[in-house]
Structure formats: structure tokens, C-alpha cells
Amino acid sequence: MVDVIKQRLDSLREVMKREKLAAFIFPSTDAHQSEYVAPHWQGREWISGFNGSAGIAVVTLTKAALWTDSRYFLAAEQQLKGTEYQLMKQRVEGTPTIAQWLGEQLAEVDSPEVGLDGMVNSYHEMQALVAELRQKGGITVRTNFDPLDIIWKDRPSIPDFPVEIQPLEYAGETLQSKLSRIRKALRVLHADGMLVSALDDIAWTLNLRGTDVHCVPVFVSYLLISSNKVSLFVDERKLTPQVTAYLAENGVSLYKYNKVEDELRTYSEYNILLDGDETSYRLWKAVKCQEIVSSASPIPVMKAVKNETEVKGFRRAMLRDGIAMVKFLRWLKPAVEMGGQTEMSVDRKLTSLRSEQPLFRDISFDTIAGYHEHGAIVHYEATTQTDAQLRPEGMILIDSGAQYQDGTTDITRTIALGPVSEKMKRIYTLVLKAHIQIELVKFPDGASGTQLDAVGRRCLWREGLNYLHGTGHGVGSYLSVHEGPHQIRMEWKPTPLRAGMTITDEPGIYLAGEFGVRIENTLLVTNYVQTDFGKFLQMEPLTLCPIDTAPIEMELMTPEEKMWLNDYHRMVFEKLSPWLEEDDKNWLKEATKPLK
């Protein structure tokens, strides 16, 4: 792979010289600012060899560097090894910004110009980068050129897989009702219309789903909503007669996907709302109407608060997922003891068991199954080169999830496969304590996830421990497993948590070269109590799966924490046992027996 990356960089630099570009920047996103992207837009991976979901590659005529966050530090070190790419660790002291690095690298170049594809870089990112580069020696930016169109000879085409209707029995709200709410929000923002670029927002609004992106049931498109018209820009080959008729019945006009830029140039309403974090730089610049209302899209918050039907769907999906997880966990340790199991084989087994459940559509992300030191790689993905043989000792971290038509699941369990060290027990127990504290918290309506983050981390900070990823993210309803805008994380995220939101609780500790521990449930924010001081909220676990008690250091657990775990395990057994065969039920009874 090292030689392949060198050849690709050589080809890129030949094109850069011809185009008089001093550098080119490759983000990890697509034309819709998606986290997970279709193969057509996986250019950053193609040019660098790094396959993480977050990262930016920057190539000059003589150097190459890749920026990524803490989830991928270890994976990036391994994947970039032997290439000329220098790893830049984001949010680590001493790491330069892209503009700072380019300013240093291009200091001796006369009138340097940097290239970016304006269709895959958001307006806000571009605006900030252009301003910073201008300060670093007058570097200019070109946005109308994509060298991958020239050098990536077998570049996959934009996907055109079929679209399907998400029935009202799972969606819980009609397309027309959603449009009415969106238009009402636009009036409050003094906007006549809006462009929707985010694929999950489009799928949610229209009650449609697709398979254009691995593990995320969305379809490549744009949606333009005005006061009296709705326009969907999509490859019509995706649309079955049923979907076409459904859209026509709901007054949705169809246009070719690649005509969105032309339509924006002739947009006749007085103004339009554009979300600078979701709208590409090129589309923003195409708008010619009198005023652009620069504002966050109102759709993500609407989508984040699940309606009653969606909540019921989540509960059903979690029940089926819990059944699959119990079958898997009962199988796991005996299978490892018999020998022959690897990280990849247990991944296949878990996916197979999930696929037996009704309404299963896909996994919700590529399973992370990290044994021993691989567990310390936050977003590890086993390959044939790294696939570790499992032994009846130590711990394996398994982060996995599924897409069911009535709900999306995301769960992490760290499991002792046999004897574990005292160090492992201590770290495991501290992570469990952090997990429990988030589930125990009660908080006033209007609090953000940032204000709750320290509640979970506190017991880790006392021990001088920390993790650099977020504590929790929203989860879509048969949509993206990572959903915003609400999060639980250290960095300031002002979106308040509201009853009806789903969010994960996933603290972890990762010791490079040794092991990692993460424990994750998906939670539902619910009403707790109304007092003279206002409304208070709480967290309800939706995930139904036992937490391994074998590695717990009991002396570290408080009575309140033991009570929470016992209550959780009681609920898991009560809800799952009626649906289990006798052997699975007996195993679950043992796995959920109360702590003393």
C-alpha cells in the first residue's frame, strides 16, 4: 500500500504543477457534509490510505500531512506508517492548524495558491480557512477544481440505489406535517425558504430511506423548500413508481441531482436560509437572491426529538437487539475456549445473529471488535492483516449496532474472556462508575450535554484519567447512528437536551499498547419532576443487555452504583427473558444476578 500511495501522490503532484497549485486539501466529507460517505467521495482515504471517518489530508509539492482527532491517533499511526504523511493530532498542544502548517511550508513560494473542491467543503469551513490563509503570507484559494477527476481512474460513480418509503407506522408523522413545522420555523427566522443538504435531514423530512451510504439508510439528493414549493434534486433512477407517486401526491417536484446549482442561481424568493455548516461553499456562492439568512437548520432539532411512534420503535428495536446480544454473549466465551475465534469471526457471528431478527436492515456502523491492545484504538476495525486470535484471557471491546426499520441501535460492551489483571479490573470499574453517573443524573430542562459531561468524567479525573472523545451522541430513528445537534462532550455544545431525545452514554479509558475499556448504552431523555424550580429531566436506558460483572472491583463501587446496576439488570432480565429460549434465559439469569 505504501508504494500505491506514493504513486498516487506523484500523479497528484504532476496535476498540481500543471494547474499551478502549491497545495491541495482533501476533507473526509462529501457534497452534503456527511460523516459517512459513499465510495465516490472517499478521496481522502484514496490519496492517504487512512480510512477513519474524520480527517483532512493536505499535500504540497514536497510534503504531505494528515489531521485527525483522538479517536483515530493509533489507527492513523499504523495506516500512515511508511508513507510520507506526517500525522497531525488535532487538539493536542503543539499541533499546528492547517493554515499554520501551509504558511510554513509555502513561505518561500511566490503567490501560492491552494486548491480545494468547493463542493465538498462547507461554507463556514472555507470562510475560516480562506481568511486564515490570507493572513499567512497572502495564500489564495481555488475552489473550482477536483484533481481526483483526473488521477482517480476507477473512481466509483455517485450511487443510484433504490429509495423506499418509511411507512407512517414507523415514522409517526406525515411529510406534510413536517413541512408545516419547517415552514413555521422558517417564518420565525424571517426566511422564505431553505436548502437542505444533509442527507439524513432530507430522508427524515420526506419519510424516505435509501442505501447509498454504507450503514446509513439515506440517498444522495438535495431538497429545496420554499413557501409554496418543495423541490427534490435526485437521480430519478433511484425512484420506484411507488415513490414517484408518493412524492407527486405530496406536491414534491423532481429535478436532476446535478441541477441544484442552476436552480439556486435562479431562486426567485426574496431570501433563503442556508446552514453554513451543511451547505457547500460552491452552492452558497451560487445563490443570487436578495438575502441569505445564515442560520442553523431547524430540522436537526426536530429530528432529534423523537415522537411517540419513534420511541416505541426504539423500544422494539432494542428488544430485538438485546435478544441477539444475549445469544452472542452466551456463545462467545465457550467459543473462545474451544479456539479458532478471532476479532473478525466474532464480528461475523454477531452480525449473523442480528440479521435473524425481524426488521433488520443492516449494521449501523462497522463493528469495532478490539482484543487486548486493539481495544485501545478507539475506532479500531480489524483487517486480515491485524485480525487477532482470541484467547480465554484478558478483555475484548465490542462496539456495534444495527439498523432496524423501526430504530437504530448502538451498544458497547467490554467483556472478560477469562482471567484479567488487577489493573484491568480497576480501569473497567472506573469506566463503569462513569457510565452509571450519567445514567443517574437528574438535570433541569434546558441544560446542555456539555454541562453533564463532567458528571461522568469526575470519577476518572480523580484518578488522573481521561478520554478525548465525546461521552454521548444522538441516535437516529432508522437513520444515522451519529445524530446531532445535541451531544454530551467537554467542548461547548449549546443545544439543550429535551425530553424525547436519544443519546448514548459511552465513557472509556484507553491504554496504548495494553487494552481499552468502553461501556455504552443508548438512552432516552425523559421527564423527571416538576417543582417550583422548573421542569427536571432524567435518563432512561433503552439498551437491553447485561454489563459484564466479572471484571468489577467491588470495593470501588458505591451502594448507589451497585443499586443502579442491579436495577438495570433486573429490567434487562424482565424484558428479555420472555422472548428467550431456555438456555439463553438461564445464561441471562446468571449474567444479571444481583451484586452483593
Regions found by a protein language model. Name each.
Residues 1-596:
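Active-site neighborhoods and metal-handling regions in enzymes and metal-associated proteins
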